[in-house]
């Protein structure tokens, strides 16, 4: 194997990993060749398909290129086009039996690694590809194409404008081309920069342009839309499948003499690398980097935005020639890059050019992207390797769209928001250069003349060493990437260059050399300090001198600001390993043309990613550049002036730094000579001094001494660079874990002494005299927003947030702000554990420490509120609003923000690790995924001793040695070892490692349960936060978690005597007990104190109940007052203690022990202490007032209105009823039950009056009033008695009230205010109240008043409650407080009842019913609610859940905070199978069978679910008996209950005559007109009872087969399997259900179901009945239509052609008109069910008035037949 190693190769040891398979080189080459062959075949097919399109594009582009080439050829050195790149070689990578990786730096003796890989050198274009990257097919006309690549890559207005200043004649043509052919230019640029977009993996396409500059694009196989052909290069880029690499590295090398580089590995992704080279540099020595560390770490830690140090590469210093063509080095994983220079010109070398959004978004792993254009200026360094690249890709595309509109550039380089260096020119008229610059952390503002000495920009002078850091930037903020689901698409290993100045710096405390013989050859004899300083001043100190910027060309600066705002999202390298970022200092050796020069002061990057962070820094402005003096020498380390300036500068990053800090060299600030900027914009002139640094995140560290900076270099080049301190010092101040070298988090520098905005940066910041009159910095300066400090921070931090004033791009700014929050998720200490909200259902963070309101974060994003550390404690003592929190608590720079409650963490403030990444908290809110910084360098060991005998080589060898030992654990986010921190932090860190425990939590009375993953640190608050939805921020949760032993129901049947003396039980303690027969939760009921006794006939029981009501009212008043004092929890507990009593007569497990858990209790800890079985039950907290009252009512108001509140509360409770009838199981069939229910309500009413008058002791009056109203209600409710339903001994997991069937007694009901439906076919006004009959004078059609005839409606006592609840719902709507809760809980209101009286026609949609004297009470409650400013509603919330022992319970509606998806199931009456006796089978359906049976002596029908039923059918079956348990109407099928034993069975009313379809099909059956009108009315009335529920219930399957006829020939609506509430109707619910002939035509168009769809179906049913009675035979709909052969044609033809069933000839005109109105094509033109009922009543009146006319129609028809 050694014989095959070419000379000059670098052998890198590669440790074998047990989980990684080592593939020999030959085998791998064979596999690659096979893949390449397949890919070549695919290429050929793709080429044939693309040839025609490519030819057309090539022709057009070549013409443009020829024109552009003439201009470029004249500009670039006159005759540089003939230069060729030599010594182009493919790096030969071999895997020596899994032991080492060999990188061949010299031409290999054999062909390239991949047979299809080739290096085609044609003139100036060199394409180097490896694997299947075959872009070299058609490299013709390379000279011209390369020049045009450079031209077209920056063929934007900016570069062309800059060329206008230099080359007037040529640039005019270029401008024309740019303006007229932007799309073409953009396509050209896309083609130039197009990478072979891979379906799988990475490919690198190196297109050298303009002699020796190179354009390297790397796609990670993400974007499949970037398959643009390199038409300019005549390269037909094919989408190929890349070779599969295991442990070996895919290295692409193009040296010119010798080169050096670094490598990294990945087990998921082939790591590609170009080794940089210079003409005069020697081969670099790569220290032994343990690739196994990479693999192991990638496997374990690269799961989120994590990073770790891979190793160190030592650069070999060399002398620099005057014209050295240093190529740029770009890798997917490892980079050490510099710029490419050519004499007199700065060449665009690398990257995704301006006009390829997709490529730019995907090329986030490029270290440098330099885009050069005609103007010989560096337009863009687009560097990535940053963690949150994907987070902002979409928004960046939007930003580019804004640029497209204003700058005529379809695609700008703004996509690479995570770019590391941004070199740009400010010469564009449309400020495109600023757009490009604002994308990047630092820009090299190059001269328009572009003259840059190669010695100033040489890769070898970058530094002595480079730290390679691995990071994963492919975790999208909107994605749900879990801890075990890493995405390696953007896995990068970035290079951080280290610089050293003298040997003393090598004697740092944290390292000692144990291997002095390592790297002996790496002496620094060739280090050229003078040349390094030239490079330092030019490359590191970002200074732009643009002499050609035109003032009039900044018209779009405000739009650019928006772009800048958007682009600054990822400028922090949030989620990236910090590559080399340098300070804006030093004077570049560029030609300085002082013509309106704009000094783009790219200051330290903004870690918190404020929208305008780089607006303030890199825009065209009159900034005085902070540069260092030209006479800086390598030996001098002056400390003068800079300390004072730092101290006085409010922008400095060292507010609290000591004066005499030795850790950094500070040179005096000098203003740039080119500060004159005549370019102003009136939109931005108001942006003053603070703009440059407003958005910079400042970390104010205190108590920092010289020891805290032991981990930093001090260099005469004034570039302070973090040392890779792998061993943490005890104070943890300067360890590498706080450096973004290994920490991806944007706030990872929180413990760093250096500015957070520049992780590897000298601490000098902008000059205090910086003024930004920049026309591109359209920003407003906001106050510094406090960050809720991690407890590890000893001093305050505040970041300045500048909001964007640009109104044109608000949406983009909002999106970017969201991305800012995403980026700020990483603003954590390096020791923060990763918390995945999506993955872990139980987060370990207390809810009080988390702002769980997503909407708040989104709103704050509009204001650029990236203060992710703001908390809203759910504790009432910390109930400040989020926005108020940000605006009110604005501490001074040295004043810490408001203290966080101590329960956040037990870690003291002095601890260096935080309990939680506050940015992770916010990311939970905003994006449902958390990306936290990697916990790094929390080492247990102390720093090694200082050794004075070691040289620089020892530093790097020690780093590698220490890295091998510690990287696998130190930089794994799941393993944190920090002995210096408190144990609480270590516990938090170890929570991810502990085995999760799963518990079951039951809701209420056990109706539902869910499995929850908890850990030892999971608190009750965490569980509540997962199951609650709070409408008001900071609202205390209204649920309590109880620990109990059993969910069994009470089996005691207490007698009335027992009940009479039983005290009332507070709902707060027993409202959620699992009592099916005694405690019934009706969560929709807003009634507060309405409780029903079984037989409250004695005075004692009444007095007891009254006293209970008084106590509750008093408590409510206290709660109302205490809401403003934020003491709800205490008062609620008091109420619970006062009323929490159980019936002593009950001997069952109702008295089982239970414990209410506090929010701070640890779930598992409490469970361990519990004796016996432990069951967690969530119960509603009855006494908590509405959350909205806290913010809307004042304590004085509450105090003044207490009495009125008491009165109003009970009025409301009296008038509001439950969703369904509530009665004791022992009195289901008793007449006394409903009377008792109503009497108690009235008794409460009188009691409230007594409370209002303060006559609490007048029990006799109470009794008197009670009996009075008792008898009064008996009279009104005589027809409302409930038929008995026998008891079931089986307990139900779903508690339900006893459901009653309607009685046979009827009462009158009037529809006085419903608009009448004009049945005259000549009258088009449906709502004409002056309707008259113009068809026949003999008919004597009654007028509107006469049509208000009686409609038989069966009455139920439960309907009285329903109406009252609707009234109360209206009250809440007026008060704007509890609308959501009431509406949610009123979903299943029963609509109609007796004696409906409506106040206005607006009540057509639903009919509220009131019962007798209860109606005025409802009106009183309305007025009281309005007058008391929402206090009544709040008190109602407290009183909603009073219970009586062993009777029924009504749950608070407004206090219920369940999520909609987790609402408790409705009541279902469970029947024991032993009570059912099957008789015979009477029918069968698709998934059920119907039997005739006997239940409790009554004939019933049992619907049995078939065994082969699918899960969907089972759900429909369950839904049907759910709905049947909700509704109760005389025209709906009566529901007795369900049986769940063995098979699911429903017990319903037995209908002897079968369905309407069946009875109409009998030809011998005589159907008369009275029976027709009866069936019509009953069918419509049954559907109307569904539609008038709240929310309305849509049947969705109305047809004659689902309308049943009982023995009395009454019609019953049945089959509710497809019924669904209208509020749950979505686009997916618009799927056509039911029989096609009955489906409304709008359903075919995808419109959701509504009540009008049921009306259409009713119209078809009315037609069927009418046709049957007139013709005497049944006819199916569309039976006579010969064009219809299939059912699905009916829906299509009815929707598209408007066909309808044929109307019989003898149909009465009014009836015909009614039917046609029901099936109208327009749903809005169809009448409501109430209108149809009135119309049918009118028709029946017509029949009664002249029956012979209707009968003659039948007789005439019989004669005709």
Swiss-Prot record:
Residues 238-256, 573-582 have a biased composition (Polar residues). Residues 18-47, 60-269, 322-458, 545-717, 749-783, 798-830, 842-956, 972-997, 1081-1151, 1179-1305, 1318-1343, 1355-1459 are annotated as: Disordered. The active site is at residue 1597. One of its GO terms (cellular component) is cytoplasm. The keyword Ribonucleoprotein does not apply. Keywords: ATP-binding, Kinase, Nucleotide-binding, Serine/threonine-protein kinase, Transferase. Residues 19-47, 60-85, 92-105, 112-237, 257-269, 322-341, 348-451, 546-572, 591-627, 674-697, 759-778, 805-824, 847-885, 902-956, 979-990, 1081-1149, 1180-1262, 1288-1303, 1320-1338, 1359-1386, 1393-1454 have a biased composition (Low complexity). Belongs to the protein kinase superfamily. TKL Ser/Thr protein kinase family. This is Probable serine/threonine-protein kinase DDB_G0282963. It comes from Dictyostelium discoideum (Social amoeba). The lineage of its organism: Eukaryota, Amoebozoa, Evosea, Eumycetozoa, Dictyostelia.
């Amino acid at each position: 194997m050694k014989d095959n190693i070419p000379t000059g190769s670098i052998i890198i040891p590669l440790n074998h990993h047990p989980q990684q398979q080592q593939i020999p080189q030959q085998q791998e080459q064979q596999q690659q060749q096979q893949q390449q062959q397949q890919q070549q075949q695919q290429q050929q097919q793709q080429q044939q398909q693309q040839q025609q399109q490519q030819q057309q594009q090539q022709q057009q582009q070549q013409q443009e290129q020829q024109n552009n080439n003439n201009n470029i050829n004249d500009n670039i050195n006159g005759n540089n086009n003939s230069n060729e790149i030599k010594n182009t070689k493919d790096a030969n990578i071999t895997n020596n039996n899994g032991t080492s990786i060999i990188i061949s730096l010299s031409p290999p003796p054999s062909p390239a690694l991949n047979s299809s890989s080739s290096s085609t050198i044609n003139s100036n274009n060199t394409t180097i590809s490896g694997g299947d990257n075959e872009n070299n097919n058609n490299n013709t006309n390379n000279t011209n194409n390369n020049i045009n690549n450079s031209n077209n890559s920056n063929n934007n207005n900016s570069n062309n404008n800059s060329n206008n200043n230099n080359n007037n004649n040529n640039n005019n043509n270029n401008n024309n081309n740019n303006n007229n052919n932007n799309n073409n230019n953009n396509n050209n640029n896309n083609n130039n920069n197009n990478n072979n977009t891979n379906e799988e993996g990475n490919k690198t396409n190196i297109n050298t342009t303009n002699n020796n500059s190179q354009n390297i694009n790397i796609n990670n196989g993400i974007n499949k839309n970037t398959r643009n052909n390199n038409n300019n290069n005549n390269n037909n880029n094919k989408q190929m499948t890349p070779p599969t690499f295991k442990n070996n590295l895919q290295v692409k090398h193009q040296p010119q003499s010798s080169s050096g580089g670094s490598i990294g590995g990945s087990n998921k992704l082939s790591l590609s690398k170009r080794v940089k080279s210079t003409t005069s540099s020697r081969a670099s020595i790569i220290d032994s980097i343990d690739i196994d560390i990479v693999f192991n770490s990638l496997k374990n830690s690269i799961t989120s935005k994590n990073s770790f140090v891979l190793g160190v590469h030592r650069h070999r210093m060399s002398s620099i020639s005057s014209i050295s063509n240093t190529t740029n080095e770009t890798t997917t994983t490892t980079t050490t890059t510099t710029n490419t220079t050519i004499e007199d010109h700065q060449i665009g070398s690398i990257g995704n050019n301006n006009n390829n959004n997709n490529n730019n978004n995907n090329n986030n792993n490029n270290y440098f992207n330099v885009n050069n254009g005609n103007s010989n200026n560096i337009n863009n360094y687009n560097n990535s390797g940053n963690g949150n690249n994907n987070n902002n890709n979409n928004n960046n595309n939007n930003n580019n769209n804004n640029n497209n509109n204003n700058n005529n550039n379809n695609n700008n380089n703004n996509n690479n928001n995570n770019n590391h260096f941004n070199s740009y020119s400010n010469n564009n008229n449309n400020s495109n250069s600023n757009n490009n610059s604002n994308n990047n952390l630092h820009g090299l503002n190059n001269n328009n003349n572009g003259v840059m000495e190669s010695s100033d920009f040489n890769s070898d002078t970058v530094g002595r060493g480079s730290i390679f850091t691995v990071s994963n930037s492919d975790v999208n903020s909107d994605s749900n990437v879990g801890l075990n689901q890493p995405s390696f698409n953007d896995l990068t290993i970035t290079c951080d260059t280290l610089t050293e100045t003298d040997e003393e710096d090598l004697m740092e405390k944290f390292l000692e050399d144990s291997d002095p013989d390592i790297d002996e050859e790496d002496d620094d004899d060739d280090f050229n300090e003078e040349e390094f300083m030239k490079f330092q001043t030019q490359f590191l100190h970002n200074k732009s001198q643009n002499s050609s910027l035109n003032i009039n060309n900044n018209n779009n600066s405000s739009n650019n600001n928006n772009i800048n705002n958007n682009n600054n999202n990822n400028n922090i390298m949030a989620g990236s390993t910090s590559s080399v970022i340098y300070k804006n200092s030093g004077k570049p050796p560029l030609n300085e043309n002082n013509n309106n020069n704009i000094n783009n002061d790219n200051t330290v990057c903004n870690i918190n990613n404020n929208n305008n962070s780089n607006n303030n820094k890199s825009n065209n402005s009159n900034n005085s550049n902070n540069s260092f003096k030209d006479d800086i020498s390598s030996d001098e380390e002056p400390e003068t002036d800079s300390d004072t300036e730092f101290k006085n500068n409010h922008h400095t990053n060292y507010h609290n730094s000591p004066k005499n800090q030795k850790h950094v060299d500070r040179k005096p600030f000098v203003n740039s000579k080119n500060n004159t900027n005549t370019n102003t914009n009136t939109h931005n002139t108001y942006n003053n001094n603070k703009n440059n640094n407003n958005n910079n995140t400042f970390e104010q560290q205190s108590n920092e001494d010289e020891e805290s900076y032991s981990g930093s270099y001090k260099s005469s080049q004034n570039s302070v660079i973090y040392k890779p301190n792998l061993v943490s010092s005890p104070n943890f101040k300067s360890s590498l874990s706080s450096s973004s070298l290994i920490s991806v988090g944007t706030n990872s520098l929180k413990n760093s002494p250096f500015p957070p905005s520049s992780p590897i940066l000298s601490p000098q910041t902008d000059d205090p005299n910086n003024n930004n009159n920049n026309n591109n910095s359209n920003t407003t300066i906001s106050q510094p927003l406090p960050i809720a400090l991690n407890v590890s921070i000893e001093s305050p931090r505040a970041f300045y947030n500048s909001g964007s004033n640009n109104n044109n791009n608000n949406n983009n700014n909002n999106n970017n702000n969201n991305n800012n929050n995403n980026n700020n998720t990483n603003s954590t200490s390096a020791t923060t554990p990763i918390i995945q909200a999506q993955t872990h259902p139980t987060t370990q963070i207390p809810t009080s420490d988390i702002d769980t309101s997503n909407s708040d974060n989104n709103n704050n994003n509009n204001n650029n509120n990236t203060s992710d550390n703001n908390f809203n404690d759910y504790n009432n003592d910390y109930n400040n609003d989020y926005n108020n929190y940000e605006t009110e608590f604005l501490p001074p720079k040295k004043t810490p923000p408001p203290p966080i409650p101590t329960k956040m963490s037990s870690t003291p403030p002095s601890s260096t690790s935080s309990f939680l990444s506050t940015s992770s908290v916010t990311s939970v809110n905003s994006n449902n995924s958390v990306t936290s910084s990697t916990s790094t360098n929390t080492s247990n060991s102390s720093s090694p001793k200082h050794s004075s005998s070691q040289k620089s080589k020892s530093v790097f060898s020690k780093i590698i040695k220490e890295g091998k030992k510690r990287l696998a654990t130190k930089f794994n986010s799941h393993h944190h070892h920090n002995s210096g921190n408190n144990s609480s932090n270590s516990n938090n860190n170890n929570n991810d490692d502990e085995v999760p425990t799963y518990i079951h939590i039951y809701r209420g009375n056990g109706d539902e349960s869910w499995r929850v993953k908890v850990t030892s640190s999971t608190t009750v608050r965490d569980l509540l936060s997962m199951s609650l939805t709070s409408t008001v921020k900071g609202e205390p949760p209204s649920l309590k978690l109880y620990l109990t032993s059993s969910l069994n129901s009470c089996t005691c049947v207490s007698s009335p005597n027992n009940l009479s003396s039983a005290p009332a039980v507070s709902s707060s303690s027993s409202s959620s007990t699992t009592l099916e027969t005694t405690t019934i939760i009706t969560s929709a009921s807003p009634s507060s104190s309405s409780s029903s006794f079984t037989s409250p006939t004695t005075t004692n029981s009444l007095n007891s109940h009254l006293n209970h009501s008084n106590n509750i009212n008093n408590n409510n008043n206290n709660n109302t007052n205490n809401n403003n004092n934020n003491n709800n929890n205490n008062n609620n507990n008091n109420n619970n203690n006062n009323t929490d009593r159980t019936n002593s007569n009950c001997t069952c497990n109702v008295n089982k022990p239970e414990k209410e858990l506090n929010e701070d209790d640890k779930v598992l800890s409490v469970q361990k202490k519990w004796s016996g079985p432990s069951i967690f039950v969530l119960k509603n907290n009855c006494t908590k007032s509405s959350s909205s009252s806290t913010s809307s009512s004042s304590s004085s108001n509450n105090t003044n209105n207490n009495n009125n509140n008491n009165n109003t509360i009970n009025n409301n409770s009296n008038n509001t009823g439950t969703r369904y009838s509530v009665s004791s199981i022992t009195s289901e069939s008793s007449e006394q039950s409903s009377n008792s229910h109503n009497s108690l309500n009235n008794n409460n009413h009188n009691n409230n009056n007594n409370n209002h008058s303060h006559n609490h002791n007048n029990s006799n009056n109470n009794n008197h009033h009670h009996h009075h109203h008792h008898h009064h209600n008996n009279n009104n409710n005589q027809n409302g008695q409930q038929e008995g339903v026998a008891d079931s001994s089986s307990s139900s997991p779903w508690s339900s009230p006893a459901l009653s069937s309607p009685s046979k007694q009827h009462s009158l009901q009037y529809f006085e205010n419903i608009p009448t439906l004009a049945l005259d076919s000549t009258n088009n006004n449906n709502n004409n109240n002056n309707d008259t009959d113009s068809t026949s004078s003999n008919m004597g059609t009654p007028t509107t008043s006469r049509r208000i005839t009686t409609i038989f409606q069966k009455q139920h006592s439960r309907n009285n409650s329903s109406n009252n609840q609707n009234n109360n719902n209206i009250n809440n709507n007026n008060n704007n407080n509890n609308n959501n809760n009431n509406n949610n809980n009123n979903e299943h209101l029963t609509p109609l009842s007796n004696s409906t009286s409506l106040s206005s026609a607006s009540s057509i949609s639903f009919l509220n019913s009131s019962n007798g004297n209860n109606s005025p009470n409802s009106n009183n409650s309305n007025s009281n609610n309005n007058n008391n400013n929402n206090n009544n509603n709040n008190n109602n919330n407290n009183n909603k859940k009073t219970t009586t022992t062993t009777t029924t319970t009504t749950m608070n509606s407004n206090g219920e905070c369940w999520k909609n998806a987790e609402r408790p199931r409705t009541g279902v009456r469970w029947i024991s199978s032993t009570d059912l006796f099957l008789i015979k089978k009477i029918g069968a359906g698709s998934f059920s069978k119907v039997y005739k049976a006997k239940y409790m002596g009554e004939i019933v029908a049992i619907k049995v679910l078939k065994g082969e039923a699918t899960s969907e059918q089972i759900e429909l079956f369950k839904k049907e008996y759910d709905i049947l348990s909700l509704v109760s109407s005389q025209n709906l099928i009566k529901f007795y209950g369900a049986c769940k034993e063995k098979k699911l069975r429903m017990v319903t009313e037995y209908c002897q005559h079968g369905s309407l379809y069946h009875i109409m099909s009998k030809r011998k059956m005589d159907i008369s007109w009275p029976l027709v009108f009866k069936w019509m009315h009953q069918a419509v009335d049954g559907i109307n009872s569904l539609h008038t529920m709240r929310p309305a219930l849509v049947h969705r399957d109305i047809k004659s087969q689902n309308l049943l006829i009982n023995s009395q020939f009454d019609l019953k609506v049945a089959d509710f399997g497809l019924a669904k509430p209208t509020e749950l109707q979505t686009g997916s619910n618009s799927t056509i259900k039911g029989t096609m002939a009955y489906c409304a035509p709008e359903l075919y168009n995808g419109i959701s179901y509504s009540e009008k769809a049921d009306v259409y179906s009713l119209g078809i049913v009315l037609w069927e009945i009418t046709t049957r009675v007139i013709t005497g035979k049944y006819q199916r709909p569309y039976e006579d239509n010969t064009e219809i052969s299939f059912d699905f044609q009916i829906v299509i033809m009815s929707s598209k052609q408007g066909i309808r069933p044929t109307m019989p000839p003898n149909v009465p005109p009014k009836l015909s008109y009614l039917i046609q109105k029901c099936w109208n094509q327009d749903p809005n033109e169809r009448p409501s069910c109430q209108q149809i009922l009135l119309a049918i009543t009118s028709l029946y009146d017509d029949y009664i008035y002249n029956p012979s006319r209707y009968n003659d129609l039948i007789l005439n028809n019989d004669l005709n037949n």
